[in-house]
Amino acid sequence: MRFLGLGLAEPVPDATTVWLFRQQLKQQGLIEELFEQFDRDLRDQRYQPKGGQIVDAAVIPVPKQHNTKEEKQKLAQGEIPESWQQKPHPLSHKDTDAHWTKKNDQSCFGYKNHISIDVEYGFIRPYQVTDASVHDSQVLGALLDQQNQGEEVWADSAYGSESIEWIIHILQFLSHIHEGVNRNHPLTAQQEEDNRERSQVRAKVEQVFGHWVNEMGGK
């Protein structure tokens, strides 16, 4: 309420109103411009990104689509069903960009928010939004903040691969990616200790996602 300049006695916009307003901003191509302005304002207030950065991703579910088998096949191919194109009103109520993914052995339909926060202040700096089927590691290169005054990067084991380590090295960052557990190759005592230390830092990004889960139904 304080952010919007609303008083205690004034009505608060409901979720639908906020969503419709955001859609208007999106259609006019203003989302990125507003976020960049917000980031500039943070820097002007001396909230420079520092201390390194933490990257992570969270699934944001949307209502499931009730589509026919033929419609699902078209959507899977990246096409809009012909019947929708002929009926603009139904099309406006269909989400043609969201996709399915698996999270903790449960199927989720929606999008995925990929973010990088600075360790010092915990503000979201670069971010990317994809459909839920995109793997966390696929957008790492776009998330790394070159303006962060720290060189260290923290991430969970979903980002653990030789190609990701190569990207981090090429961009001159220092990797603190969580060691993944392998059934045939258990972690050493040192690796477990390193993971505990990494988790203490990564807890900051979990707080950001915790808010999304509690307030917006993320996963």
Give, region by region, the residue ranges found by the protein language model.
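DNA-recognition alpha helix
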Residues: 1
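Helix-centered, glycine/charged polyanion-binding patches within enzymatic domains
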Residues: 72, 152, 157-219
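Polybasic low-complexity intrinsically disordered regions
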Residues: 4-171
